[in-house]
Structure formats: structure tokens, C-alpha cells
């Protein structure tokens, strides 16, 4: 049984699978302040033996998670961006500097869609990454997420109160103006990047992240929403790890330890 962890800037998303390549048995999310709640989740799945995760929240939280996993007898692996892995080639000037969440999302998108795509992850920050038809990561954008944009206005503008607003074509109050402006800024960045993929007919915009629904309806491009793309990418990595750990069989297939069967 395998635990997948996407440790982001605000939340920890988790998924439990029976084995690599199988559907989710359970999944959910915790805030950073709720990190110790992961102990109860792990305790509910006593057969857990492995963890594959992405952590962009820093060493302190990673160390706390490592301690919990060690206590539970779970072997953990935090992924790192590579130069070429799982059908994706890393075009970053320094491949190791690419965020592990972006790397896992690119791998998940490649498995989902074999053609050219934009991988848009909207959370605390928004990333807009271009993956071409050959699996080459061509680069991407990082911009403040909607809530960071809103908070920046509130922190740096005198007399401005943050109130819930709605996205409208022609806002006529401050709350709607802020929400609409921030959402349209996100959509504009996505569409500007997507224009570089045109006229490739099979180009797709893969949307993920908790803030994506706040601007998805503004997009005029072909989109495909995915709730937890980083976890999907981690599942691909976990499956490859499992395959690599199986000893070769004389027939050329791989023998999976534990049951003697050839798969």
C-alpha cells in the first residue's frame, strides 16, 4: 500500500493506493497546522509501506513528516526534478531548480494527454507550464495566485477592505472589481501562453489546483480540469519505482516479490 503526498504552500494533499497504478482508496487534504492529523490517516491504513511525495513547503515541515513516517514504519521518497524522466524532458536552465510539484504535474499531464498542453496549477501561486507534443518542457510562468493578488492590494492600498466579490464583465463595486481583476489576470496569463501553442489542433489546457474554478469559466481555450494532478504524477513515479524494484525474470518479464506470480 502506498501513500502519495503533495505538500504545498498552504495544504498537504494525500492519497492512498493499494499498489502502484491502482485507483485511489482514499484521499483528502490537511492544512499545515493540521499536519499531525496525518498520523490518524496513516493509522487507518496499517498496510502502508511506502510514501512518494513532493514537498515545496520547506525542510521543517518535511522533517516533521519524515518523523511521522519513520515512526509508522513507512519508507519515504521525496521526488526531485530530473533532466529526463517518465516521458518528460526538463527544459529548465538548471533542471534541479524546477519545483517538484511542477515536475510531478508535468508528468501527470504527459500521462493524461500525449499532445501539446499547458499545465496550469492554481493555488497559493499560479504556474503556467508549456509541455510540447514530444514531452519537452519548454518553460513556464509563475505568478501570484488570486488570493495573493487580493492580499497584496489590501496590504499596499490605503483604506481598501477585502470583501467577497464576484467576477463580472463590468464590475460596479470595489469587491467585484478586485475579484474580477485578479481572476482576469490569471485567465489572461493562461490565454497568452496558450496562444503560443496555436495552431496545434490537439493543444489542451490542463487545469488543476483549488483556485482554478475561480477563473476557469473566463477561458476561451480548450480545457480539461483535473482535481489533483500532482498526485496523479506522483502515482506515475510510484509505479515506475515499483517496476524498477522488481527483479528480472529469466523470461524477460518481472517477478513481483511476495506472491511468486509473473506480471
From Swiss-Prot:
InterPro entries: ATPase_NBD (IPR043129), Type_III_PanK (IPR004619)
Metabolic or biological pathway: Cofactor biosynthesis; coenzyme A biosynthesis; CoA from (R)-pantothenate: step 1/5
Ligand binding (substrate): 92, 99-102, 174
Any matching Pfam family: Pan_kinase
UniProt KW keywords: ATP-binding, Coenzyme A biosynthesis, Cytoplasm, Kinase, Nucleotide-binding, Potassium, Transferase
Source domain of life: Bacteria
Listed GO MF terms: ATP binding; pantothenate kinase activity
Location in or out of the cell: Cytoplasm
EC number: 2.7.1.33
Entry-linked SUPFAM superfamilies: Actin-like ATPase domain (SSF53067)
Classification via CDD domains: ASKHA_NBD_PanK-III
Chain residues that bind ATP: 6-13, 124
Swiss-Prot/TrEMBL cofactor(s): NH4(+); K(+)
Catalytic activity: (R)-pantothenate + ATP = (R)-4'-phosphopantothenate + ADP + H(+)
Active site: 101
Its biological purpose: Catalyzes the phosphorylation of pantothenate (Pan), the first step in CoA biosynthesis.
Family per record: Belongs to the type III pantothenate kinase family.
The protein's name in its UniProt record: Type III pantothenate kinase
Species in which this protein is naturally found: Azoarcus sp. (strain BH72)
Lineage: Bacteria, Pseudomonadati, Pseudomonadota, Betaproteobacteria, Rhodocyclales
Amino acid at each position: 500500500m502506498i501513500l502519495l503526498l503533495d505538500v504545498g504552500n498552504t495544504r498537504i494533499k494525500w492519497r492512498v493506493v493499494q499498489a502502484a497504478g491502482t485507483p485511489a482508496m482514499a484521499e483528502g487534504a490537511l492544512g499545515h497546522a493540521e499536519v499531525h492529523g496525518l498520523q490518524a490517516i496513516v493509522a487507518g491504513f496499517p498496510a502502508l509501506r511506502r510514501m512518494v511525495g513532493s514537498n515545496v513547503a520547506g525542510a521543517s515541515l518535511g522533517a516533521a513528516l519524515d518523523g511521522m513516517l519513520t515512526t509508522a514504519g513507512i519508507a519515504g521518497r521525496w521526488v526531485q526534478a530530473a533532466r529526463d524522466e517518465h516521458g518528460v524532458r526538463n527544459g529548465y536552465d538548471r533542471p534541479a531548480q524546477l519545483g517538484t510539484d511542477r515536475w510531478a504535474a508535468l508528468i501527470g499531464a504527459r500521462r493524461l494527454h500525449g499532445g501539446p498542453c499547458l499545465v496550469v496549477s492554481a493555488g497559493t501561486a499560479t504556474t503556467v507550464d508549456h509541455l510540447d507534443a514530444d514531452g519537452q518542457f519548454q518553460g513556464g510562468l509563475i505568478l501570484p495566485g488570486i488570493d495573493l493578488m487580493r492580499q497584496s492590494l489590501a496590504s499596499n492600498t490605503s483604506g481598501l477592505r477585502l470583501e467577497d466579490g464576484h467576477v463580472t464583465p463590468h464590475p460596479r463595486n470595489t469587491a467585484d472589481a478586485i475579484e474580477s481583476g485578479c481572476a482576469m489576470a490569471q485567465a489572461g496569463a493562461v490565454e497568452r501562453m496558450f496562444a503560443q501553442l496555436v495552431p496545434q489542433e490537439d493543444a489542451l489546457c490542463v487545469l488543476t489546483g483549488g483556485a482554478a474554478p475561480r477563473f476557469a469559466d473566463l477561458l476561451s481555450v480548450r480545457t480539461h480540469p483535473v482535481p489533483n494532478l500532482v498526485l496523479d504524477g506522483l502515482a506515475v513515479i510510484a509505479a515506475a519505482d515499483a517496476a524498477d524494484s522488481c527483479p528480472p525474470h529469466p523470461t524477460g518479464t518481472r517477478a513481483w516479490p511476495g506472491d511468486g506470480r509473473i506480471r
